[in-house]
Amino acid sequence: VGAVHIAQSLAPMATMLDFDVTVVDPRGAWATTNRFPGVKVVQEWADEAFDKMGLDVSTAVVTLTHDPKLDDPALEAALRSDVFYVGALGSKRTHAKRKDRLSEAGITEEQFARVHGPIGLNIGARSPAEIAVSILGQIIEARARRLEALLAPKVAAA
């Protein structure tokens, strides 16, 4: 969510890793196929787009705008779904404020705990491309852990 500079690095990298990428942003000047060639671009509010797209256990949601008007509805929709990954750009202070806002919207502590924020692996990333690599690394890690859990042998209690 957010047709921003980090998304311009993240989208093609994720496509190279065989993710089906959709960039969602209601701002028509930002969310264009010229800025995001080769990926699906949706010019709608994220919660409305998610309703149409459907979120499921194979979905990762990343918010990148720093704008609560855009990010919070997307996070709320993602946290009320079964997506395997939810990440939000921003500092620890921004993340704490986000937690307060989403709590007021009815998101529980348990639900909010699913948000990776600050987003990405802590690799000292600075540039948009480096931040994109750190985000994708975290998404790949989350996907691998989810698959491990699904494939783990089930032990029945006696």
Model-derived regions: residue spans:
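Short, glycine/charged-enriched secondary-structure capping and boundary segments
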Residues: 13-14, 36-38, 75-78, 101-104
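A generic structural signal for alpha->beta connector loops
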Residues: 18, 38-39, 82-83, 111-112
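ADP-ribose/adenylate-binding Rossmann-like module
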Residues: 24, 60, 65, 76-101
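Adenosine-phosphate binding glycine-rich loop
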Residues: 83, 89-158
